[in-house]
Amino acid sequence: MSNNLLLPDKNSRMQREQWKWTRMTLTRAHYKQDNKQCQHWRINSQTTREEWQMLCPGRKWILNLLTRLGLNLMIISRRDQALDMEMSLM
């Protein structure tokens, strides 16, 4: 097997794509009727202590984590909920 088959092409999308770290807040997550999880995100315009802040490089990682936790409905708005969730993710 050639090594060229294992390495991505120099012009591939994967190499051109760069991670952008954006401060996001997960405001709601729930399951749809087809058992697919739906997440509601928003970009933080300002940092407050009343919101759960997270650095999210992509939604797929957190989707998988929340699915493994058995999440079916979550609304994060109060500080105590945010702290509970933050502790469970550690």
Curated annotation (Swiss-Prot):
Where in or outside the cell is it found? Host cytoplasm, Host perinuclear region; Host cytoplasm
A GO cellular component annotation here is: host cell perinuclear region of cytoplasm
Tell me which domain of life the UniProt entry assigns to the organism this sequence originates from: Viruses
Enumerate the Gene Ontology biological process terms: symbiont-mediated suppression of host innate immune response
Q: Which UniProt keywords apply?
A: Host cytoplasm, Host-virus interaction, Inhibition of host innate immune response by virus, Inhibition of host RLR pathway by virus, Viral immunoevasion
Q: What is its main location?
A: host cell
| Described function | Antagonizes host type-I IFN signaling pathway.
| Family, as annotated | Belongs to the hantavirus NS-S protein family.
Q: What is this protein called?
A: Non-structural protein NS-S
- Source species: Puumala virus (strain Bank vole/Russia/CG1820/1984)
Taxonomic lineage of the native organism: Viruses, Riboviria, Orthornavirae, Negarnaviricota, Polyploviricotina
